[in-house]
Amino acid sequence: MLRGNDTGSDLAELLWDNGAPAPLRPPPPPPFQPFTCSAAATTSPPAHDYLFIKNLMRGGGAANHHHHDDDDDDDDDVPWLHYHPVVDDDDDADADTAPLPPDYCAALLSGLSDHLPPPAAAASRVDPDPCSSSHGAVVPSTSAAAAKQARTSGGGGGGVMNFTFFSRPLQQRPSGGETASASASAAATSTVPVESTVVQAATNRLRSTPLFSDQRMAWLHPPKPSPRAAAPPPPPPLAPTTRHRLDTAAATATVAQRLPPSEARAPDAPPPAATATATTSSVCSGNGDRRQLNWRDSHNNQSAEWSASQDELDLDDELAGVHRRSAARSSKRSRTAEVHNLSERRRRDRINEKMRALQELIPNCNKIDKASMLEEAIEYLKTLQLQVQMMSMGTGMFVPPMMLPAAAAAMQHHHMQMQQMAGPMAAAAHFPHLGAAAAMGLAGFGMPAAAQFPCPMFPAAPPMSMFAPPPPPPPFPHAAATAVEQTPSPPGAADAGNAPAVKQA
């Protein structure tokens, strides 16, 4: 068995078993070489060493290598380039990697096919003296080891950042006037080379796992533009936009009056260009859509103005309702006052009419105020009551005291005493034909004369005069006879004297 002490010789150990070589263990992993996608940086390994080792591993020996034709060699060159990557169970972190596109290593295949030698040249690399030792050694070159490393790393599929989509920041689709600036920024970004990730080797087999800390840092930070790339032109200045966009012309005019002149904008100004600054795979942008923000602002302002107008309308309605209620209340009060005033006027008119009628009934009444007129009416009523009492006393009919007031009852009692004292002379006051002496006698006792009463006096013989006692005889008979002669006789007395005497039987 041959061992290579030099690490640069890349010797492989082979064990001969009945004329066929069998590998004892896999060769040690070669040092890592950075992966590049360009065809110029790819080293083309000698394909005859690779084919020879493959034939030895199949068990056909060196002699079997000459029996294959050129078509089989072309088919068996690098079949792993067209296979999908194999993802292990423990490589869940690498599950987001995608297979390589078919034309990804087209340049590598074309370079490899140019360096294919004839099959016979592969046998010259075998040691001519296999019997000098129990083991034969095949010395592949460094380029063959690099090809193996590329094959193993390509089969894993997780150690290389395959997509160039993640090597540049995410951009929004340009529209309208943004085509020129977007194309310039895309051209500047495409010149940035793809950064490869670090691949670490396992102990028992070659295994490629990306260091996600470095990969994420490469994704999160935007790539630095090359100094040779042309700087993108500055974005056009943003045209100022109005804060409110209303549908009607009147609302637009109102908003234009409220805004200062510096915030006024052109009628057909294009929308501002939104620059994309996202660097991750998620669709995120540093600057939001300003058109949507403006729409939200205008919508909020319209809602605020609409609510304010609604509040004003409600307040106006409330004020109008209060005015209507107050007007109705005031009109009701005025109508009630008018009715009250009319009734009071009618009542005063009736009172005045009655007072005028009372003034006409009271003689010699020259009072104007109501209190004086009422006093005159009271005195006149008292006089009338006294006259009625005197008339009742003269006719012999007495009114019950209960029907007269207290003053009239006291006066009646006083007159009764006077009548008892005067005797039949008290009745002569009601008869003027009795003579002035009787009237004077009545006046001496404090009785007013009959002429003072406005009521007429009717001469009539009282019913009680027949029961009166005869007058007393005069003190001198001669004078009494003369008085009798002078006294007129009643008209029936003469007829009675001339009447014939009635004969008695």
Curated annotation (Swiss-Prot):
Residues 324-334 have a biased composition (Basic residues). Residues 174-199, 492-505 have a biased composition (Low complexity). Residues 335-384 form the bHLH domain. Keywords: Brassinosteroid signaling pathway, Growth regulation, Nucleus, Repressor, Transcription, Transcription regulation. It is found in: Nucleus. Coiled coil: none annotated. Residues 23-33, 222-239 have a biased composition (Pro residues). Plants silencing APG show enhanced bending of the lamina joints and produce grains increased in size, caused by elongated cells in lemma. This is Transcription factor APG. It comes from Oryza sativa subsp. japonica.
